Each structure stands twice: as C-alpha cells, then as structure tokens.
A protein has these predicted regions:
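Non-catalytic C-terminal accessory modules of carbohydrate-active enzymes
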Residues: 1-130
Length: 130
C-alpha cells in the first residue's frame, strides 16, 4: 500500500512507481511491492488524469476540454504539446463546480473545441467551468 512508501524495508520498491501488485495481508511478505516497471498502471493513471480529470481530450481533428475536478479546485493550467503545437490551457472554476463548462475561448474567440494548429505554433485556451 502507498502508506508504506516510507518503509523501503517492507515495500522494496521505489516510492514513485506504480507496481503491478502489492502482496496481501495473508502472506508473510505483506506490503512488498512487485514488478514496478512491468505494468501499464502508470500509463493508464496518466491517461485517466489528463483526459478525464483535467478533461483535455485529443481527437482526430480537434481537442476538447471537459474537466471533472474537486469543487475546491479554483483554477489549473495544462501545457499540452499535440501534433507539434503547444496548447496553453487555463481553466478557472469561479463557482466551485465539479463538472460543466460555461465558456470556452480559443485564442480569444468563442469556441466549442480546439482545432489542430500548425506545428510550432502556440494556442491559448481559456475555459470557465460552470
């Protein structure tokens, strides 16, 4: 379990890794973590966090932003490189909602999604939750 990250003699794995499994309570090696670099867990955690919590989802010809965050998150920024362009996405949450988009601006213009920009360009996206 993550609570044992500070007990390397028990965990026997680096605290920054997602291990494939942690030995259960009924085993004599309870708490020992195994196969830290032979798992897809970290990739799936990144995918879930960026695309479904922060809500930045690329598609074939556009990208959308639809966050689902704790109500006490008042703002966050995501810098996302996609197809050679840099997308600077700033999300504000003035009403403390957990989901929903009240306004969406791409480079200062109202929009409902982010079009693909040329490689090397920078795109500014402002999202207000509500």
């Amino acid at each position: 379990p993550a609570l044992q990250n500070d007990r390397i003699e028990v965990r026997e794995a680096e605290p920054y890794t997602y291990c494939q499994f942690v030995v259960g309570r009924d085993h004599t090696a309870f708490g020992r973590a195994r196969h830290p670099f032979m798992t897809g867990s970290s990739g799936w955690a990144y995918y879930a966090a960026t695309q479904y919590l922060l809500g930045v989802r690329p598609d074939f010809d556009h990208m959308t932003v639809d966050p689902c965050v704790p109500a006490d998150w008042r703002a966050f920024t995501v810098n996302r490189r996609w197809r050679g362009a840099m997308y600077q996405i700033h999300v504000t949450n003035p009403d403390g909602v957990e989901k929903g988009v009240a306004s969406f601006r791409v480079d200062g213009r109202e929009a409902d999604r982010i079009p693909v920009r040329p490689a090397g360009s920078v795109c500014r996206v402002d999202v207000v939750m509500g």
